[in-house]
Amino acid sequence: MSDLPDQTPKDDSVLFEANGVDPRLLEILICPATRQPLAYDRARHELVSKNARLAYPIRGGIPIMLEEEARDLDDTEGTAGGGEA
C-alpha cells in the first residue's frame, strides 16, 4: 500500500470543464490519427487536431478520442485562434 496521497480526480469535470482544460491532461493526449498534440477549443468544447483536420468532442467531461466520432474541420477552422495549446 502506498503512502502517497491519491491524485485521481473525483469527478471528470475537473479535467474538462466549461472554463478550461487541465493542462496536464492536454500534455498526454494525442490525436489517434496523427499521433500529434491536440489543442483545446474552449468555444466548441472540443479537442482539435490541426494536422488531421479533426475535432474530437468532449461529452460529460470525457474526451471521445474516436475518429468516427470526430467532426471534420472546414477550411476556416484549425488555422485561426480559439484554441489553447
Curated annotation (Swiss-Prot):
GO terms for cellular component: cytosol. Pfam families: Trm112p. Transmembrane segments: none annotated. InterPro entries: Trm112-like. Belongs to the UPF0434 family. This is UPF0434 protein HNE_3545. It comes from Hyphomonas neptunium (strain ATCC 15444). The lineage of its organism: Bacteria, Pseudomonadati, Pseudomonadota, Alphaproteobacteria, Hyphomonadales.
